[in-house]
């Protein structure tokens, strides 16, 4: 041990020193404004070659990416600043050693991370960012520093800088300021590149290009165009199915096509395309389908077919009046119609003095005075005063009415009524009220409406004398007026005998109907007025029905029947009192007598 001690003592002091002296670099590190980012001054000790090799490996040999280099530099600065603060505070040397060892461990961790290669041009602007394989750059010759750029020609630098300023007005600040030694620029790099080696998001967009050589585009897009193209690759129009690559074409399409809407001049409706407007004019807006007969226009073809079938199916009126445009079947009818527009009335009736415009009107009027019936039915030899009456009568023999509506199936005896009915389907209302302006399909309907303004009531009640404006109102009144209740408990036959003084004579055989004994019926039935036309049995009315019986001079003899004759057709309103069934009292009383006699025989 004694021999070994002198050997140990003979070791030069230059190869043996404490760890604190080797790693305490707070006072030996400084910044300078030259091409190299850092420079370190150290004593001639063993740690000096090691530190130089580390610096060369970080910055030149392994060509670490700039973001990792900045991370290491930032960590060293932070560690250096922390060491300076510890020296100023007079901390222990052991604490300094621990901090330095932690900083070296962090450097080793950062060094082992994946390499990222940043390519710059002569003007220190970033061209490409790529990743290396296993920490080795793909093409180290592509990395350029500011010291290499300084050897270039000044003319090329000016030209490149001018072009690059136009193409890339907003360069990446963290990657451009990497080559400068200003303290402000270094602080900006440390802010943009974190301690963990992350890079900004703008640089990661170009990582897919790899380590290929930079290719300068002839006419690069401006940042606004790039942003628009990246925002939507395919832009679809909202109003039509067209698709565009750029927003500029889409806006141009919107201005030309959709914002200049096609407006219909007739109805004001707007359309996107001109073809839609033309289709609208042909179908919906313009009535371009015209009837040849009456010149009426329609929108649809089927409407024209229905119009021809309904209106012009039976005949075609090709001739029209020049004054009122009324149409007729022949020109002769037109000439006869023109007389209606003149004020002259040369044809006068000799009997009553009434004047007419046409001779035919005078002939028709003269039939009222003479009673002549020139129109005869060939089937039953019945004669009529007017031709329309004969036409209406012919429907009895035919089995159906002559004029039938093809639209609804309703039939009519007279053509006048048929024409008025057809107007309900076509929508024509030529008759207008002079007071309120309401239009109607027929003149009788207009006259009935006009009574609401004038207050005219032409329909009186025969029983009570009350007057009504319309015939249906009178009919409803008659049903109510004849339904007057009689006293309860009185037999209907007895009620009739009490109220009728003409039947109170017992000699007639009807006054005491419940107690009277009528002899057996004679060979000639007393109640049959005519053997060819017997009266059908009538049902007995309600016991509470009251019959308005008026005294009259007609007496019916049961033994002698009246002379056979054809009864005339019943009038609309008889002068005699009617019961609730619209029958006279005589026929009803005869029916009661027949029923009573039949009950007594049984």
Curated annotation (Swiss-Prot):
<dbReference type="GO" id="GO:0000981">
    <property type="term" value="F:DNA-binding transcription factor activity, RNA polymerase II-specific"/>
</dbReference>
<dbReference type="InterPro" id="IPR036236">
    <property type="entry name" value="Znf_C2H2_sf"/>
</dbReference>
<feature type="compositionally biased region" description="Pro residues">
    <location>
        <begin position="561"/>
        <end position="571"/>
    </location>
</feature>
<keyword id="KW-0862">Zinc</keyword>
<protein>
    <recommendedName>
        <fullName>Zinc finger protein 652-B</fullName>
    </recommendedName>
</protein>
<feature type="zinc finger region" description="C2H2-type 5">
    <location>
        <begin position="347"/>
        <end position="369"/>
    </location>
</feature>
<keyword id="KW-0479">Metal-binding</keyword>
<feature type="zinc finger region" description="C2H2-type 4">
    <location>
        <begin position="319"/>
        <end position="341"/>
    </location>
</feature>
<feature type="compositionally biased region" description="Basic and acidic residues">
    <location>
        <begin position="65"/>
        <end position="79"/>
    </location>
</feature>
<feature type="compositionally biased region" description="Acidic residues">
    <location>
        <begin position="80"/>
        <end position="108"/>
    </location>
</feature>
<feature type="zinc finger region" description="C2H2-type 9; degenerate">
    <location>
        <begin position="459"/>
        <end position="482"/>
    </location>
</feature>
<comment type="similarity">
    <text>Belongs to the krueppel C2H2-type zinc-finger protein family.</text>
</comment>
<feature type="compositionally biased region" description="Acidic residues">
    <location>
        <begin position="148"/>
        <end position="167"/>
    </location>
</feature>
<keyword id="KW-0539">Nucleus</keyword>
<dbReference type="GO" id="GO:0005634">
    <property type="term" value="C:nucleus"/>
</dbReference>
<feature type="compositionally biased region" description="Basic residues">
    <location>
        <begin position="545"/>
        <end position="557"/>
    </location>
</feature>
<keyword id="KW-0804">Transcription</keyword>
<dbReference type="GO" id="GO:0008270">
    <property type="term" value="F:zinc ion binding"/>
</dbReference>
<keyword id="KW-0238">DNA-binding</keyword>
<feature type="zinc finger region" description="C2H2-type 8">
    <location>
        <begin position="431"/>
        <end position="453"/>
    </location>
</feature>
<comment type="function">
    <text>May be involved in transcriptional regulation.</text>
</comment>
<keyword id="KW-0677">Repeat</keyword>
<dbReference type="InterPro" id="IPR050589">
    <property type="entry name" value="Ikaros_C2H2-ZF"/>
</dbReference>
<feature type="region of interest" description="Disordered">
    <location>
        <begin position="60"/>
        <end position="232"/>
    </location>
</feature>
<feature type="zinc finger region" description="C2H2-type 3">
    <location>
        <begin position="289"/>
        <end position="312"/>
    </location>
</feature>
<keyword id="KW-0863">Zinc-finger</keyword>
<feature type="zinc finger region" description="C2H2-type 2; degenerate">
    <location>
        <begin position="262"/>
        <end position="284"/>
    </location>
</feature>
<feature type="zinc finger region" description="C2H2-type 7">
    <location>
        <begin position="403"/>
        <end position="425"/>
    </location>
</feature>
<feature type="zinc finger region" description="C2H2-type 1">
    <location>
        <begin position="235"/>
        <end position="258"/>
    </location>
</feature>
<dbReference type="GO" id="GO:0006357">
    <property type="term" value="P:regulation of transcription by RNA polymerase II"/>
</dbReference>
<dbReference type="GO" id="GO:0000978">
    <property type="term" value="F:RNA polymerase II cis-regulatory region sequence-specific DNA binding"/>
</dbReference>
<feature type="zinc finger region" description="C2H2-type 6">
    <location>
        <begin position="375"/>
        <end position="397"/>
    </location>
</feature>
<feature type="compositionally biased region" description="Basic and acidic residues">
    <location>
        <begin position="222"/>
        <end position="232"/>
    </location>
</feature>
<dbReference type="Pfam" id="PF00096">
    <property type="entry name" value="zf-C2H2"/>
</dbReference>
<dbReference type="InterPro" id="IPR013087">
    <property type="entry name" value="Znf_C2H2_type"/>
</dbReference>
<keyword id="KW-0805">Transcription regulation</keyword>
<feature type="region of interest" description="Disordered">
    <location>
        <begin position="543"/>
        <end position="575"/>
    </location>
</feature>
């Amino acid at each position: 041990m004694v021999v070994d001690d002198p050997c140990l003592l003979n070791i030069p002091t230059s190869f043996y020193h404490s760890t604190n002296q080797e790693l305490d670099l707070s006072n030996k590190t400084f910044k300078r404004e030259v091409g190299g980012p850092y420079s370190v001054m150290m004593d001639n000790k063993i740690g000096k070659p090691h530190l130089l090799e580390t610096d060369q490996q970080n910055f030149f040999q392994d060509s670490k990416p700039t973001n990792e280099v900045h991370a290491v530099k930032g960590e060293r600065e932070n560690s250096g600043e922390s060491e300076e603060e510890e020296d100023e505070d007079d901390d222990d040397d052991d604490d300094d050693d621990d901090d330095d060892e932690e900083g070296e461990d962090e450097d080793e961790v950062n060094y082992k991370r994946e390499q990222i290669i940043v390519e710059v041009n002569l003007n220190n602007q970033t061209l490409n960012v790529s990743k290396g394989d296993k920490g080795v750059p793909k093409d180290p010759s592509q990395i350029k520093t500011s010291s290499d750029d300084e050897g270039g020609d000044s003319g090329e630098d000016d030209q490149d800088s001018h072009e690059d300023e136009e193409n890339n007005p907003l360069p990446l600040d963290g990657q451009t300021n990497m080559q400068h030694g200003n303290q402000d620029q270094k602080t900006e790099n440390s802010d943009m590149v974190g301690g963990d080696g992350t890079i900004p998001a703008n640089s990661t967009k170009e990582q897919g290009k790899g380590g290929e050589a930079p290719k300068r585009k002839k006419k690069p897009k401006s940042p606004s165009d790039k942003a628009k193209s990246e925002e939507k690759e395919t832009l679809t129009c909202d109003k039509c199915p067209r698709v565009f690559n750029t927003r500029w074409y889409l806006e141009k399409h919107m201005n030309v096509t959709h914002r200049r809407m096609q407006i219909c001049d007739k109805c004001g409706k707007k359309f996107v395309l001109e073809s839609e407007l033309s289709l609208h004019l042909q179908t919906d807006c313009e009535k371009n389908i015209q009837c040849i007969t009456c010149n009426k226009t329609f929108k649809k073809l089927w409407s024209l077919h229905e119009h021809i079938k309904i209106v012009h199916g039976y005949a075609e009126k090709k001739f029209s009046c020049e004054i009122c445009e009324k149409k007729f079947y022949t020109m002769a009818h037109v000439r006869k119609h023109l007389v209606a527009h003149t004020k002259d009335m040369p044809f006068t009736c000799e009997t009553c003095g009434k004047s007419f415009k046409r001779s035919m009107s005078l002939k028709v009027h003269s039939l009222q005075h003479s009673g002549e019936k020139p129109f005869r039915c060939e089937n039953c030899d019945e004669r009529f005063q007017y031709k329309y009456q004969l036409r209406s009568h012919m429907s009895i023999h035919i089995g159906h009415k002559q004029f039938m509506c093809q639209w609804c199936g309703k039939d009519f005896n007279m053509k006048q009524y048929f024409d008025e009915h057809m107007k309900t389907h076509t929508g024509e209302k030529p008759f207008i009220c002079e007071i309120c302006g309401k239009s109607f399909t027929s003149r009788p309907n207009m006259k009935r409406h006009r009574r609401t303004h004038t207050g005219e009531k032409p329909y009186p009640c025969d029983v009570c004398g009350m007057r009504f404006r319309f015939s249906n109102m009178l009919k409803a009144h008659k049903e109510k007026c004849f339904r007057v209740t009689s006293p309860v408990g009185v037999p209907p036959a007895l009620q009739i005998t009490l109220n009728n003084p003409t039947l109170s004579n017992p000699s007639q055989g009807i006054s005491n109907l419940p107690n009277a004994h009528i002899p057996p019926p004679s060979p000639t039935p007393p109640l049959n007025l005519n053997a060819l036309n017997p009266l059908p049995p009538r049902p007995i009315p309600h016991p509470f029905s009251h019959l308005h019986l008026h005294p009259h001079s007609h007496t019916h003899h049961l033994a002698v029947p009246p002379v056979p004759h054809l009864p005339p057709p019943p009038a609309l309103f008889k002068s005699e009192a009617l019961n609730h069934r619209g029958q006279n009292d005589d026929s009803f009383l005869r029916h009661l007598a027949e029923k009573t006699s039949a009950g007594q025989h049984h």
